[in-house]
From Swiss-Prot:
GO biological process: lactate metabolic process
Localization per record: Cytoplasm
Main location: cytoplasm
Associated pathway: Fermentation; pyruvate fermentation to lactate; (S)-lactate from pyruvate: step 1/1
Top-level taxon of origin: Eukaryota
Residues that bind substrate: R105, N137, R168, T247
Annotated organism of origin: Parachaenichthys charcoti
Protein name per Swiss-Prot or TrEMBL: L-lactate dehydrogenase A chain
Alphabetical list of NCBIfam families matching this protein: L-LDH-NAD, PRK00066.1, PRK06223.1
Lineage of origin: Eukaryota, Metazoa, Chordata, Craniata, Vertebrata
Length: 331
């Protein structure tokens, strides 16, 4: 008899029960790992699967996380074979070519489309009912690409979008007002990145509209220069990349925030990337961020935001820029 047999006597043969809320992270780069640790530390799933083409890096990261199993409640698995991801509830895609210093998110496109042609069919094969969350940049275009390649209905393909931009925005407004970001309600919509649209008309603290107090807020003529805050949001990622080489922690926490709303069926409203054709005067098949309700079935509803004419124009301009790139893509 082995030590194990001497120690433990079976009462019944265990039937394998699949995980109810398995999450997969595709890509073990900086963003993938920050997403993984954020998901683990928030205890969101009972199984976390990780997959990447870089076998040694993947093996090392998985092993490193598994060594912390005592401090976690999540089973951690990893393999370059996508069978490890089977029956995931949410699949987070962070894989792709990384943005170089000074490189625009749009420049990354075709490099990442080619990577997605391998990743997406594999995800669909093993988790045909999952909710796909795209994080790789440029996120709005790649969410469209994932939607096209997966054949999933639009409510099951979500881009992390401006969830992070809005968090950065709220943090900076909070800094200026000496308040916690959760008390500074503010939304950034449109494209994640350079042409994102700050909705100044909706910025409020405790229901008090800041534009009511300062009608010039967000315009060139504003003596307090609130507009600079949005510039800081846009420049924020480039600044971090310049200083440390990549961004990871905030996007990782942002991803975990979205995964939590889905897995816990919270019906929380997040600015995430979805098909906006027919909204805010957008005519083309593009994905942009608008406030959306997230729950167990994915993206169930869109909130109709009241945008000012110039804000709406900016959204349409983003849409045109993205469509200009999308129609050139070979899918």
């Amino acid at each position: 008899m082995s030590t194990k047999e001497k120690l433990i006597s079976h009462v019944m043969k265990e039937e394998p029960v699949g995980s109810r809320n398995k999450v997969t992270v595709v890509g073990v780069g900086m963003v993938g790992m920050a997403s993984a640790i954020s998901i683990l530390l928030k205890d969101l799933c009972d199984e976390l699967a990780m997959v990447d083409v870089m076998e040694d890096k993947l093996k090392g990261e998985v092993m490193d996380l598994q060594h912390g199993s005592l401090f976690l409640k999540t089973k951690i698995v990893g393999d370059k074979d996508y069978s490890v991801t089977a029956n995931s509830k949410v699949v987070v895609v962070t894989a792709g070519a990384r943005q170089q210093e000074g490189e625009s998110r749009l420049n990354l496109v075709q490099r990442n489309v080619n990577i997605f042609k391998f990743i997406i069919p594999n995800i669909v094969k093993y988790s045909p009912n999952c909710i796909l969350m795209v994080v790789s940049n440029p996120v709005d275009i790649l969410t469209y690409v994932a939607w096209k390649l997966s054949g999933f209905p639009r409510h099951r393909v979500i881009g992390s979008g401006t969830n992070l931009d809005s968090a950065r925005f709220r943090h900076l407004i909070g800094e200026k007002l000496h308040l916690h970001p959760s008390s500074c309600h503010a939304w950034i919509v449109g494209e994640h990145g350079d042409s994102s649209v700050p909705v100044w008309s909706g910025v409020n603290v405790a229901g008090v509209s800041l534009q009511d107090l300062n009608p010039q807020m967000g315009t060139e003529g504003d003596g307090e220069n609130w507009k600079a805050i949005h510039k800081e949001v846009v420049d924020g990622a480039y600044e971090v990349i310049k200083l440390k080489g990549y961004t990871s922690w905030a996007i990782g926490m942002s991803v975990a925030d979205l995964v939590e709303s889905i897995i816990k069926n919270m019906h929380k409203v997040h600015p995430v990337s979805t098909l906006v054709q027919g909204m805010h005067g957008v005519k083309d098949e593009v994905f942009l961020s608008v406030p959306c309700v997230l729950g167990n079935s994915g993206l169930t509803d869109v909130i109709h935001m009241t945008l000012k004419a110039d804000e709406e124009k900016q959204v349409q301009k983003s849409a045109e820029t993205l469509w200009g790139v999308q129609k050139e893509l070979t899918l």
